[in-house]
């Protein structure tokens, strides 16, 4: 065990500000956990802020670490506005355990530093896209969101924004971290909040403005087929009240609520899985769909940025769960065909998203901007390009999208629900399914594509180091092909922890370390063939790579 980490753990055990329940947790920690949570390294930001297990220590999410991080964040935002004081911040939270406690600490730090804080009335759990919207709409200088998105219920997080409602980029968080004092000062910082600088928003006014602005982003808004039965689950998260209200506002009259999951619950009692990318997450929704004969289901993750849609496929007698790539492509194709753009249309997506969107953009006169993985990069790109161009869609392969550049700078499940239900109604009017629209109309025009993302969990608190070893192995491997597909080039993007195998015929495989979870993700982009054959090839490639890299099964 690292002796410094052990000594720091002892310091926490003897410190009067550390409560007895936290001391019990420290006492029960393994040597590996002590080394992780009590490391003297400064914290690091992932693709969506700082996330981690709620635990004592410099690298656990606790009242001390939130105060420490907030102090650095406020100093950074002040450095961008050196002559402005007080600054104005929005502070919000999701439905997770200790969220109210943690954002209370954040408020105390900000007000103790002489700045103004706005919160939602009653400290109401708030969707992440709405946080970004309010910062941008009301011209705040920044904002803090206490959320861990779809991470396990044991986790929490610290997500921060600039005055445009966009997440800070890596160079900005690097500057923020440089402003932080040594982590050993964490226990000695006692913020004294000033309630005179704390204000509350009128939630109903904010919701109305948001709904009105969202409605303006639709392509075609009429009353046809708004009685389509659609099952909805919000997984105990921040959308469970607002999303049904929003869809009712748009005129939808047959939204079927998965009631056990559509209540706030910090323990996520009726949702064992929180990521709509996982089919296991949909178990209860499938039961509701079966009982009501609904052919469409929607799932939204706990902080309401990720939206996913699934459709019953009568041919396979099973559900098809649309990926982020598939949803993003459908929105891009639909809007470019049916919307009149007043300025140059553009699409923003990431380096691991499907190449199909480039073909669509080229045919219909749009351009594509690709960013690093993480919506913080997408949001900042939209912020840049929206000045002279008009957004078609910004999307991630991991089921997140933004369909309007006028609202916010986050992936937005409300925007996604509105536009995807609009497309579903368009398909219903044509007598086709969403899947037929995607594989029939779009593939018929541009050829078949198969994009597949496979996450592999890496165990242990030192998971990042283990995965860095895997990436090194990939770049130094002597293999020339992957099950018959010649590798024409190996690209190593060290700064974003990504390795690419460029294959023949424009195909590729990419390997990336997740910035938010202990996972190595494999991305396959295959074309120039029929879908069934492409799927078969991807499966063989994956099996080969699992053996090569000695990975656990996904």
From Swiss-Prot:
Enzyme Commission number, as recorded: 5.4.2.8
Binding-site residues, Mg(2+): 149, 301, 303, 305
Keyword terms, alphabetized: Isomerase, Magnesium, Metal-binding, Phosphoprotein
One GO-annotated biological process of the protein: carbohydrate metabolic process
Enzyme class: isomerase
The encoding gene: manB
InterPro entries per the UniProt record, alphabetical: A-D-PHexomutase_a/b/a-I, A-D-PHexomutase_a/b/a-I/II/III, A-D-PHexomutase_a/b/a-II, A-D-PHexomutase_a/b/a-III, A-D-PHexomutase_C_sf, A-D-PHexomutase_CS
Catalytic activity: alpha-D-mannose 1-phosphate = D-mannose 6-phosphate
Organism of provenance: Mycoplasma pneumoniae (strain ATCC 29342 / M129 / Subtype 1) (Mycoplasmoides pneumoniae)
UniProt protein name: Phosphomannomutase
GO MF annotation: an example: magnesium ion binding
CDD domains: PGM2
Active site per the UniProt annotation: 149 (phosphoserine intermediate)
Cofactor note: Binds 1 Mg(2+) ion per subunit.
Pfam families, per the entry: PGM_PMM_I, PGM_PMM_II, PGM_PMM_III
Cofactor: Mg(2+)
Family from the record: Belongs to the phosphohexose mutase family.
């Amino acid at each position: 065990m690292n002796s410094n980490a052990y000594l720091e753990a002892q310091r926490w055990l003897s410190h009067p500000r550390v409560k007895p329940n936290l001391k019990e947790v420290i006492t029960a920690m393994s040597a590996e956990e002590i080394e992780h949570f009590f490391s003297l390294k400064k914290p690091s930001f992932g693709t969506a802020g700082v996330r981690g297990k709620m635990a004592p220590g410099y690298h656990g999410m606790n009242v001390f670490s939130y105060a420490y991080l907030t102090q650095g964040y406020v100093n950074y935002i002040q450095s961008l506005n050196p002559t402005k004081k007080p600054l104005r911040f929005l502070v919000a939270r999701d439905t997770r355990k200790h969220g109210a406690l943690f954002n209370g600490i954040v408020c105390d730090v900000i007000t103790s530093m002489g700045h103004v804080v706005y919160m939602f009335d009653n400290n109401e759990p708030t969707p992440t896209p709405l946080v970004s919207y309010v910062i941008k709409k009301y011209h705040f200088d920044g904002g803090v969101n206490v959320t861990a998105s779809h991470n396990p219920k044991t986790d929490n997080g610290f997500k921060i924004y600039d005055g445009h409602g966009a997440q800070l980029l890596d160079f900005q968080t690097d500057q923020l971290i440089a402003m932080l004092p040594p982590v050993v000062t964490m226990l000695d910082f006692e913020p004294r909040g000033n309630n005179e600088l704390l204000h509350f928003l009128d939630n109903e006014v904010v919701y109305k403005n948001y709904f009105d602005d969202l409605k303006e982003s639709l392509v075609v808004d009429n009353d046809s087929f708004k009685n389509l039965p659609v099952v909805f689950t919000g997984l105990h998260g921040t959308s469970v009240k607002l999303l049904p209200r929003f869809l009712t506002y748009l005129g939808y009259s047959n939204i079927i609520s998965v009631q056990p999951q559509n209540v706030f619950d910090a323990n996520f009692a009726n949702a064992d899985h929180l990521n709509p990318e996982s089919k296991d997450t949909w178990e209860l929704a499938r039961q509701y769909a079966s009982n009501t004969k609904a052919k469409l289901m929607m799932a939204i993750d706990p902080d309401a940025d990720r939206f996913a849609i699934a459709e019953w496929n009568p041919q396979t007698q099973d559900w098809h769960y649309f990926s982020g790539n598939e949803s993003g492509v459908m929105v891009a194709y639909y809007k470019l065909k049916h919307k009149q753009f007043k300025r140059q249309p553009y699409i923003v997506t990431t380096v691991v998203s499907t190449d199909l969107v480039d073909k669509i953009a080229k045919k219909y006169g749009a351009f594509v901007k690709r960013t690093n993985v993480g919506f913080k990069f997408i949001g900042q790109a939209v912020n840049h390009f929206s000045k002279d161009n008009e957004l078609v869609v910004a999307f991630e392969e991991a089921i997140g999208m933004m369909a309007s550049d006028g609202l916010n700078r986050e992936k937005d499940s409300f925007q996604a629900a509105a536009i995807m239900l609009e497309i579903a109604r368009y398909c219903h009017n044509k007598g086709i399914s969403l899947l037929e629209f995607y594989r029939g109309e779009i593939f018929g025009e541009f050829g078949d594509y198969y994009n597949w993302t496979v996450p592999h969990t890496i165990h242990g608190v030192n998971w990042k180091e283990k995965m860095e070893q895997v990436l090194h192995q990939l770049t130094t491997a002597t293999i020339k092909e992957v099950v018959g597909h010649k590798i024409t080039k190996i690209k190593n993007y060290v700064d974003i922890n990504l390795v690419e195998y460029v294959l023949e015929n424009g195909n590729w495989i990419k390997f990336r370390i997740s910035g938010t979870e202990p996972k190595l993700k494999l991305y396959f982009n295959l074309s120039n063939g029929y879908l069934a054959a492409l799927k078969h090839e991807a499966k063989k490639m994956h099996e080969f790579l699992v053996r090569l890299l000695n990975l656990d099964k996904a």
